[in-house]
UniProtKB/Swiss-Prot annotation:
Record's protein name: Sulfur carrier protein TusA
Family: Belongs to the sulfur carrier protein TusA family.
Keyword Cytoplasm attributed: yes
Gene: tusA
Swiss-Prot/TrEMBL GO biological process terms: tRNA wobble position uridine thiolation
Xref: PANTHER family: SULFUR CARRIER PROTEIN TUSA, SULFUR CARRIER PROTEIN YEDF-RELATED
Protein's job: Sulfur carrier protein involved in sulfur trafficking in the cell. Part of a sulfur-relay system required for 2-thiolation during synthesis of 2-thiouridine of the modified wobble base 5-methylaminomethyl-2-thiouridine (mnm(5)s(2)U) in tRNA. Interacts with IscS and stimulates its cysteine desulfurase activity. Accepts an activated sulfur from IscS, which is then transferred to TusD, and thus determines the direction of sulfur flow from IscS to 2-thiouridine formation. Also appears to be involved in sulfur transfer for the biosynthesis of molybdopterin.
Pfam family, any one: TusA
The protein's annotated pathway: tRNA modification
Source organism of the structure: Escherichia coli O157:H7
Subunit structure: Forms a heterotetramer with IscS. Certain pairs of proteins can bind simultaneously to IscS but TusA does not seem to be one of them. IscU can displace TusA from IscS.
Length: 81
């Protein structure tokens, strides 16, 4: 089985940051990416389990994968076009 998290185009370490900082950093990072590129987000704020999927839906990006069973949380998103 392929690890979806193993080769992202970009990585964002949001460990130790609390809402709303992780989503603000994701938004800033995604703004500088090309459509189709992927971003791995590593976070430990429980609010990200709600905020990251909501951000993807609202901004029309794809939440490719998420791992939220334990810390740190990992999210892989693909920038929409």
């Amino acid at each position: 089985m392929t690890d979806l998290f193993s080769s992202p185009d970009h990585t964002l370490d949001a460990l130790g940051l609390r809402c709303p900082e992780p989503v603000m950093m994701v938004r800033k990072t995604v703004r500088n990416m090309q459509p189709g590129e992927t971003l791995l987000i590593i976070a430990d704020d429980p609010a990200t389990t709600r905020d990251i999927p909501g951000f993807c839906t609202f901004m029309e990006h794809e939440l490719v994968a998420k791992e939220t069973d334990g810390l740190p949380y990992r999210y892989l998103i693909r920038k929409g076009g």
